[in-house]
Amino acid sequence: MALNIEEIIASVKEATVLELNDLVKAIEEEFGVTAAAPVAVAGGAAAGGAAEEQSEFDLILAGAGSQKIKVIKVVREITGLGLKEAKELVDNTPKPLKEGIAKEEAEELKAKLEEVGASVEVK
């Protein structure tokens, strides 16, 4: 008893949602596949490709830590801000310090800030 494609489509059109759900589960079990897998794989691959192509990064101060005065000094050195502005920036984290910088510069500045106890993110 061979079914052609039109008969299969007609049967699927007449089926209830519960019957279609059972059909999908049976197909997944029979062939060892899942219906959601292609979506997750495609999304993951696109995100990975975007991360590799990124050439500009943002340096974000997430927190000052316990040595706030040292962090303020380094922030002033990095940004060229005055004492008052640097203190306000450090007190109101998370805040971007530099935007659109090269990865090497971002990593150097991150290391400098972490050295004095700040928590920093590179995005």
Curated annotation (Swiss-Prot):
One of its GO terms (cellular component) is cytosolic large ribosomal subunit. Pfam families: Ribosomal_L12, Ribosomal_L12_N. GO terms for biological process: translation. InterPro entries: Ribosomal_bL12, Ribosomal_bL12_C, Ribosomal_bL12_C/ClpS-like, Ribosomal_bL12_oligo, Ribosomal_bL12_oligo_N_sf. Keywords: Ribonucleoprotein, Ribosomal protein. One of its GO terms (molecular function) is mRNA binding. SUPFAM superfamilies: ClpS-like (SSF54736), Ribosomal protein L7/12, oligomerisation (N-terminal) domain (SSF48300). Gene3D superfamilies: 3.30.1390.10, Single helix bin. Homodimer. Part of the 50S ribosomal subunit; present in 4 copies per ribosome. Forms part of the ribosomal stalk which helps the ribosome interact with GTP-bound translation factors. Forms a pentameric L10(L12)2(L12)2 complex, where L10 forms an elongated spine to which 2 L12 dimers bind in a sequential fashion. NCBIfam families: L12. Forms part of the ribosomal stalk which helps the ribosome interact with GTP-bound translation factors. Is thus essential for accurate translation. Belongs to the bacterial ribosomal protein bL12 family. This is Large ribosomal subunit protein bL12. It comes from Bacillus subtilis (strain 168).
